[in-house]
Amino acid sequence: MSGKEESSNYAATAEEEAVNQGFVLPEGKIMPNTVFVGGIDITMDEIEIRDFFTRFGNVKEVKIITDRTGVSKGYGFISFSDEVDIQKIVKSQISFHGKKLKLGPAIRKICTYVQPRPVVLSHPTPFHHAWNNQNADSYIQHSPIVSPITQYVQACPYPSSPPMAIQQIPVGCQQPGYFQVSPQWPADQRSYMFPTPAFTFNYHCCDMDPNGGEPIPREYPIDQTVSASGANPQKRYVEMSTQTIVSCLFDPANKFHSFVSQEDYLKDNRVHHLRRRESVIKRVSK
């Protein structure tokens, strides 16, 4: 008889004996020359159990299972160094300290361990972005890019239903520094919003020296905040004010400063030139 047949016959006999004693063996591998001992009192120690089971053979190891606090769970395993008849030990009715022990073959449970699969991360294709400068060397920057035009379509076939196409929303990536604006407004319907500008006017004035010296030039900065939006009269005032240069003329006769805008100055100058031209024409005609 081969070793496999003896092991199978022994396992079948041990299972029958265990069922007859009132418990069912778990699935696993039967350990040779090892006996399961149940019903151990918490007052029993390994030395007493070793001395008791030496009648069946040379005891190699006694292992009592305990919890985290070190208290016995009431069962353990006894290993023999020699070949012993495990069936004979299981069939025998053994009482220890007035308590009947539950005997059976030692079975090691089969632990199913699933090896985790390695995680593979796919990196996107690097994008070579070259930046050239006349006064510096070329720099190459590696960064992923997403096309703003490309659309991705993913097909998900199922055996119980026809294939489905799920269209994903394209993602756009805008490069900084490159802007192109193409307005689509019809003619004469565009409206502009201007932020509130702050203008600073420098008034150049000349103060008269009371001692009779030369006029002293001075500069008086004045801040003025003007709001403008659309083509309304307020915007017209802003356009005129941005081009206005205020002149300060000193009138020695009246002893006061008169402020004349550029518009009034040009108007007076134009009238002066017209009058001068008329006088020249009259002289030539004479």
Curated annotation (Swiss-Prot):
SMART domains in the record: RRM (SM00360)
GO aspect biological process, one term: 3'-UTR-mediated mRNA stabilization
InterPro entries: DAZ_dom, DAZ_RRM_vert, Nucleotide-bd_a/b_plait_sf, RBD_domain_sf, RRM_dom
Keyword list, A-Z: Cytoplasm, Developmental protein, Differentiation, Oogenesis, RNA-binding, Spermatogenesis, Translation regulation
Listed GO MF terms: mRNA 3'-UTR binding; RNA binding; translation activator activity
A single GO cellular-component term on record: mitochondrial cloud
Cellular localisation: Cytoplasm
SUPFAM superfamilies with a match to the protein in the record: RNA-binding domain, RBD
Domain DAZ, first and last residues per copy: 155-180
Record domain RRM: where: 33-114
Pfam families: RRM_1
Assembly notes: Interacts with the C-terminus of pabp1 and with epabp. Prior to oocyte maturation, found in a complex with epabp and pum2 proteins and spdy1 mRNA; pum2 dissociates from the complex during maturation.
Family: Belongs to the RRM DAZ family.
Role according to the record: RNA-binding protein that is required for primordial germ cell (PGC) differentiation and indirectly necessary for the migration of PGCs through the endoderm. May promote meiotic cell division during spermatogenesis. Shows a preference for G- and U-rich RNAs and probably binds the 3'-UTR of target mRNAs. Stimulates the initiation of translation of mRNAs through the recruitment of poly(A)-binding proteins (PABPs).
Name of this protein: Deleted in azoospermia-like-B
Species this chain originates from: Xenopus laevis (African clawed frog)
Gene from which this protein is expressed: dazl-b
